[in-house]
């Protein structure tokens, strides 16, 4: 699965180990 780059507003809750980002709904948003 692909994700967006871990930058800006994504970095605080989307960042995953590996350089891509996916939405982590468990964090609340």
UniProtKB/Swiss-Prot annotation:
Sorted UniProt keywords: Disulfide bond, EGF-like domain, Nematocyst, Secreted, Toxin
Primary location = secreted
**Know the name of this protein?**
Toxin Bcg III 15.67
MF terms (GO), sorted A to Z: toxin activity
Any one GO CC term of the record? extracellular region
> In what residue span(s) does the EGF-like domain sit?
2-29
Cystine pairs:
6-21
Location comes to: Secreted; Nematocyst
Q: What does this protein do?
A: Has both toxic and EGF activity.
Q: Does the keyword Secreted apply?
A: yes
